[in-house]
């Protein structure tokens, strides 16, 4: 008689504050991005574009991004990094038809943030999941294309663990919109009921996972204080290592 399939076949993760520890850095996003934006500014200047004052250009860009995220929350249509840059370029009269956006994104030179680290148990958990033959996915509400976030994953040594990696910026919808979960499940060839989703934001990660029918696990480390309100995860963990015995119990029914 053939073996029965495992009740849980795949584990999907959020990235920031789930696999990566951003504690103490959440309010430094502008400062973290500033040196990269300066590199983009230098690239545009070298290409012969007439640019405004560097500080004015930068602060305008972050206003564009803030407004884009506020708009996105109305229907969970994703913010797209290249589009926010183009919006800011247009505000200052730059001819976007003369800007090679792929080259501009590379000029931004995105890298892993030195102050951001893996959680202590990220690699041991991913190692165990791989050894136990789970399919592993990643879904992040990032406006950047996945190739830019891959730079971080490669730097942290975890890129090769994932069978599927998606950013909302690439897909066009952000969590909790069902489309981004459904895309990941389709690529993994796994039904929602046979997959676990682990994330730190109840209103995004957990609400979306619940709506699609995934087993939802809220990652709630001590430094995070997201309001759960009326959103109920199936399980709550405070560190990634707690996921392994939880999966074992799900497999054993």
Question: For the regions a protein language model found, what residue spans apply to each?
Answer:
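Asp-based, Mg2+/Mn2+-dependent phosphohydrolase catalytic module
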Residues: 1-11, 23, 42, 46-52, ...
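N-terminal helical cap/lid subdomain that shapes the substrate entry/recognition surface
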Residues: 4-119, 124-127, 131-132
